[in-house]
Regions:
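Primarily short, surface-exposed interaction patches in extracytoplasmic proteins
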Residues: 1-144, 149, 157-161, 166-176
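Catalytic cores of secreted/periplasmic lytic hydrolases that degrade extracellular macromolecules
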Residues: 153
Length: 182
């Protein structure tokens, strides 16, 4: 986009305004694709960072519908989550049938996947009613701090490393390790 900036205007403000403008279709489709991938394990465009015209969505009508709804809602993420979770694809069971046993491209069923290391640790802590104590003491991480809230991988927690927490230098969630390394 061509920004008309005044002499003392910060170009970052103009860029941020353009990013979240309804006139910018890329922001909505990128966020819809990431949220879809978060809930269903794979984006409508896969890989999620490859949104070239030569790599179309598996369901372009659904992508357009969700993107339009997201823009019309004023970029309301809660509404986007409701829209994704109310789709037929999200509500499918994981049990295979002869028709969908080998289908991995069309969201014909739910594909079970492992919990992330942070979610697993938080779940165990909640079920056992024993809060996890993180290095640095209560001054740095007060009681009740969840693993999902940790700021970076510099907080040394062996459990998280063993169960696949990626380093922050990894740009893609696909770098998350899915096999336990016990």
């Amino acid at each position: 986009p061509d920004f008309q900036l005044g002499p003392f205007q910060d170009p970052r403000h103009a860029l941020a305004a353009w990013f979240s403008s309804p006139d910018n279709p890329f922001f909505a489709t990128a966020l819809v694709n990431r949220m879809w991938a978060h809930f269903l394990g794979r984006g409508l465009v896969d890989p999620i960072d490859d949104s070239r015209s030569t790599n179309p969505a598996t369901n372009p009508e659904l992508m357009a519908y969700l993107s339009d709804r997201f823009i019309q809602s004023g970029f309301n993420v809660k509404q986007l989550i409701r829209d994704i979770c109310s789709t037929h694809a999200y509500q499918l069971q994981s049990q295979t049938t002869p028709l969908n046993a080998t289908d991995h491209a069309t969201f014909a069923r739910f594909y079970p996947r492992r919990l992330s290391a942070e979610v697993l640790l938080d779940g165990i802590s909640q079920v056992l009613d024993v809060p996890t104590v993180f290095p640095g003491g209560p001054g740095k991480f007060p009681a009740g701090t969840r693993a999902i809230e940790l700021p970076d991988e510099n907080v040394a927690v062996h459990f998280l490393d063993v169960f696949g927490r990626p380093g922050r230098n990894k740009a893609c969630e696909c770098e998350r390790v899915s096999e336990a390394t016990l």
